[in-house]
Amino acid sequence: MIHAFAVSVIRHERTLLEQINFRLNPGELVVTLGPNGAGKSTLLKTLAGDLPPSHGHVLLDDEPISQFSLSQLSRRRAVLSQSVHLDFPFSAMEVVLMGAQRTLSGGDPFRLSQQALEEVDAGHLAQRNYQDLSGGERQRVQIARALTQLWTGVGAGPQYLMLDEPTSALDLKHQSALLKLARKLAGKGVGVFCVLHDLHLAAQYADRILLMNHGRIVAEGAPETLITTANVREVYQVDSRILPHPVTQRPMVMID
């Protein structure tokens, strides 16, 4: 479990997170929603151990996450940032292999990297120059890198995948495929923390949603109870209508 206890983050006299209490459990998909500047990405970086809190603590399996070495953390959690810039002409496969580490399970890193590319519908991109790929293709390659990192770290303990706006460059087909993959990983015991802007996607795939604004958690819960017209109005300052999906019965958000 990753546990944030009374976490605040202050940078340059500006409060980015304030008194955050949150737990990410293995085997669940948690989606964080909120307007620009709400603190979503800051929370992800803090939970991942990349940004130390100014106050409070982040624990991984009841131990301060700051006590884990980078090598230990890399086996336990993988992070997909909003943007990754590479200035050298690596192939897509070489980028994915950057996520590989000496496996604890004896698996072949190259085979796992190829499998990860296939998982995100990017196997045909393996030998392409990463710099020549479209934004969506690069995003899928980076997702494959994160998968490879997790797969080559199997055996170190419960694992977590942190996704910061992973659908931003993807078309509709690959948005859906990515979130189905996140659900699949959660079903296998991975704790997935995902930052999104799309309320509809969050409602259809999340086990739990965090609604953030001004560095605080405004509401937390299952999509069916959290996605309400009142919450949408409070956080986004827009009026909406909430209807049940005809198949899943999960909430669908329509902005007036």
From Swiss-Prot:
Name this polypeptide is given: Hemin import ATP-binding protein HmuV
Domain ABC transporter per the UniProt entry, residue ranges: 2-239
Entry EC number(s): 7.6.2.-
Subunit organization: The complex is composed of two ATP-binding proteins (HmuV), two transmembrane proteins (HmuU) and a solute-binding protein (HmuT).
Job description of the protein: Part of the ABC transporter complex HmuTUV involved in hemin import. Responsible for energy coupling to the transport system.
The family this protein is said to belong to: Belongs to the ABC transporter superfamily. Heme (hemin) importer (TC 3.A.1.14.5) family.
GO molecular function: ATP binding; ATP hydrolysis activity
Top-rank lineage group of the source organism: Bacteria
Membrane topology: Peripheral membrane protein
Gene name as annotated: hmuV
InterPro entries in UniProt: AAA+_ATPase, ABC_transporter-like_ATP-bd, ABC_transporter-like_CS, P-loop_NTPase
Organism: Hahella chejuensis (strain KCTC 2396)
Binding site for ATP: 34-41
Gene Ontology terms: cellular component: plasma membrane
NCBIfam families recorded: PRK13548.1 (NF010068)
Keyword field: ATP-binding, Cell inner membrane, Cell membrane, Membrane, Nucleotide-binding, Translocase, Transport
UniProt signal peptide: none
A family per Pfam: ABC_tran
Coarse class of the protein's main subcellular location: membrane
Annotated compartments: Cell inner membrane
